[in-house]
Amino acid sequence: MGTSNTVSRALRLIGESGLDDGGVEVLAERLGVGSRHLRRLFLRHLGATPIAVAQTRRLHFAKKLIDETTLPMNQIALASGFGCVRRFNAGISKVYHRTPTQIRRLARQTKLQPGNQYVFRLHFRPPYHGEGMLAFLAARATPGVEFVEEGCYRRTIFLNGRDGYFEISIDQESSALVARIEFGDPRSLFFIVERIRAMFDLNADWSAIVQSLRFDPALIDRVESDPGLRVPGCWNGFELATRAILGQQITVKGATALAGRLTASFGRPLSLSLGLPLAAAKGLTHLFPTPEVLADAKLVSIGLTGARAETIRALARAVADGKIQFEGVVDADAFQQQLCEIPGIGRWTAQYVAMRALGEPDAFPSSDLGLLRAMGLQNPRELEKRAEAWRPWRAYAAMYLWKIGSQAAGGGSKLASRIQKMGMEGTVPQQVPMSL
């Protein structure tokens, strides 16, 4: 694996509080490298050590809360992950040469948000293919849980016993996402923001990725015409895996309809106690069902086959019992093996889930019919051999190939017809396509 890939994994773990238990040494051990080597990689690619990167993120987040909210300083200290006010004050004073109170006095605060509502600008390194990201998410948006319209993505969230929602729009001129969050507990804001960054793949280093893709004749034209295509992540790994199982051997549209039925039947209505009727007006009404609920749910009632229903229940039981976890995963291969032990989940789904739920940049569902079609190949082994040149960024190559394949399928050929009938987001003994 490439060194940029190691940094990418480390950033994901840091976003999941990967430095809280043992610091850089434990983080490096989880990544399978030495702590000194990890520090060198961070200095080479980011110009700062892992601890400095994590601290800078928290400081910038705290500064944002000081400037643009009326939260008390002790709540800001907790929300930005400092743990105590003393460390928070010391960190702010050292970097900004002013106390938090002095900074707030100087802040304009001309657009303060109502209580429990926050607006953040989440910057990325261009190019960023926002249109491709939103198109991908729009096709797979679960009715009631997610909604995409007019360049804006919205979804409901549940965290630490509270309901909320957020919406995302893309400001290409300032190279940032605009995240509007409504959530009642400010202590969760840092986690929410970090999860959004991962979901929209904002930490990706396009300059490193493109080096592995730009010299392949099959990709060069698309990479140059559509630079910055990212790999969409997810809010919740269990939700994504369930959605992938729902989509086995049916179209994306059909799978989306099933996900809507699943949510309406087994999901919980979004709480309106925090002034969330606005969310309902924006197409958000429910939270996706939890593993505990689906573990014993009668899923055939929404039109699933008995085998498909049992696969979802088995996954739900494994997650509810803690046997399968989607956070803090370092060994993607071991994770995929765990998934494949569940009857009805095969290598395609495992790769797809690793790609989107773990942010694994080298995940590659080589049996996917859409990928094979885009490359003009018949055998997954041939595709895997060809894809060696794209390591460690094969997930990004997959996004481009799906885009190529989806456009090529528009001609009404027999193959295109077959793709329309086959599943687009699952895993079965056959090869299963997915397209943008």
Regions found by a protein language model. Name each.
Residues M1-L436:
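HhH-family (HhH-GPD) DNA N-glycosylase catalytic core used in base-excision repair
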